[in-house]
Amino acid sequence: MKKIISTLLVAGCCLTSLMAQDVVVKGPDEKLQLVVFTSSAEKPSYSITYNGKTMLEKSPLGMNTNIGDFAKGMKLTGHTVTPIDTVYHQDRIKTSQVHYQANELNCHFENPKGQKIDVVFRVSNNDVAFRYALPRQDGKGSVTVTAEETGFRFPQQTTTFLCPQSDAMIGWKRTKPSYEEEYKADAPMSDRSQYGHGYTFP
């Protein structure tokens, strides 16, 4: 009986340790939530929910470059969360003064070769953005991305409001795609662009 209890305690500790590797950051109003999954058994990934509703299912992170693989076997070595609160001005948009608030999560990863990469997320009340930051390594002045591993896995019921990308040099005085095409509201994610060139965000 003691052996069984000891085994359960060890298993519980291991499970807690694995779960503790997942990193959570929320927007300032705590409705928008990002989770970064960093279990060593798989590639790093992330998901997004809003008010408990899934906006983005577990999606892969990472990339391959000419100096190393930053997608598989990545280990989280640390992370920081920094609140962002700033005001900036634009004289050519509808709102000239913008008050921007967000929480920034910086995840520090290391691949099996000890090469480092940061994934920097920003979560505001309505938006999520992220970027990769590669510190200079082995004296390299530039890096070539050879394969993109980043994914965006939307729930099956997701619909779109997108503008199909037009053929080039057609229409009035051959100026397209200078004008927006007709939008289709709540179109299924599986619908292909009518021109075969993908879509443009409005």
Residue ranges and their predicted role:
Residues D22-P202:
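N-terminal accessory beta-strand-rich subdomains and adjacent acidic, glycine-rich linkers
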Residues M1-D22:
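Bacterial Sec-dependent N-terminal signal peptides
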